[in-house]
Amino acid sequence: MSNETITQAVSERYARAAATGEQICCPTGYNFEDLRTFVPEEVLKVSYGCGTPAGLDTVRAGETVLDIGSGGGIDCFEASRRVGPTGRVVGIDMTDEMLAIARRNAPIAAANLGYASSNVEFRKGMAEAMPVEDGSIDLIISNCVINLAPEKRKVFHEMFRVLRPGGRFTISDIVSEHPVPNYLNHDVEKWGNCLSSALQLGDYVSGMIEAGFLGIHQIRSIPWQEIDGIHFLSITLTGYKLPAAVEPNGVRFATLRGPFSQVVDELGQRYQRGVPQAVNARTVQLLKTPPFEPLFLLSETPLSLEPSDARWLAVLPEQVPCVWRGDYAMLTGPFADVEDDDHHVFRRGSPLEICSKTLKVLESDLYRRHFAMINRAAGEISGSQVACSPTGGCC
């Protein structure tokens, strides 16, 4: 199918939903009871998403927020509440019917919030060519939309263009664990259902890094659907457009605290837990972003850690037999690859089969935020305990 055919089919699907209230298959999590206090019912009826509200927990008063694929405006109106009357919200959408609903209800939502006028503007446009000024946005949000775009890498480059240096995105979307085959890619209906259009997680993130984003990490992920053996996940990711690097005041070394024994960051720098590593200004800037900062110590002089140090982070597997239950783990970030204390090497976006002992480690607080989990066994397992290797070690 051509890009034009895909775009037209998706637009018609959402236009029909706007007119009829048709439900589109996306795993939503809106708190409608709260939203009804200021969002009109007409908007709530045409609200679809896969992670809700996408990224708005980090909004600060007075910021400018962009919603890609704003639909009827639900996330824009929630953003409006959070940025306050001094902030600004821009929503872009390609479907006239959705834009009409959003524009019609903007003054109502503003009045319900007690604002003198609406601080939300809805613009018609494509995600691959956004009608938004360069460097004008503090936060980009998007809710189960980018996977519908035929040219996702263009979308990521557009996101980078419109963000201010130091800006960030938080987007929820559908990704797959394996490549989506051609017979699904050419299924128009499944494009509208966020399935045929899904990228593998690794390809999704690599497109963002290629556009210039760093510090890309998971906020949450949940299994969604399985079609012909392909698992689809709903995932929410955050990343940053770092400002120009400046020489840090005194920081010359970084020491990995854990919980991994080794990691490689998005700039290709390798670290071993407890061992100081010389770093440049750009790396220091990256390691100061929220996903990295708790895991590193930055110092003027080399700083080593021992396992007895309270700053050392580790979660060791139990020394017991394990069970293979069909569980797979996918590293989601912010590292390119990592190694745990049982010598498993995880690469971002690549599923790795794990046993029950490793699953318990990855479900711990220190590890959970870095992984998406799927199960391929559908409950059909033997449950037999085994020693994973001749030495009794795991896997």
Where are these regions (language model features)?
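A short glycine-rich, Lys/Arg-flanked "PGG" loop and its adjoining helix->strand segment in the class I
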Residues: 153-168
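C-terminal lobe and adjacent flexible extensions of AdoMet/dcAdoMet transferase-like proteins
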Residues: 211, 217-223, 229-395
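Class I SAM-dependent methyltransferase SAM/SAH-binding core
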Residues: 61-129
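Short, glycine-/aromatic-enriched active-site segment of Class I SAM-dependent methyltransferases
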Residues: 175-195
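Short alpha-helix
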Residues: 197-212
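Conserved alpha-helix/loop element of class I SAM-dependent methyltransferases that forms part
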Residues: 27-64, 78, 82
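A short SAM/SAH-binding and catalytic strip from SAM-dependent methyltransferases
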Residues: 138-151
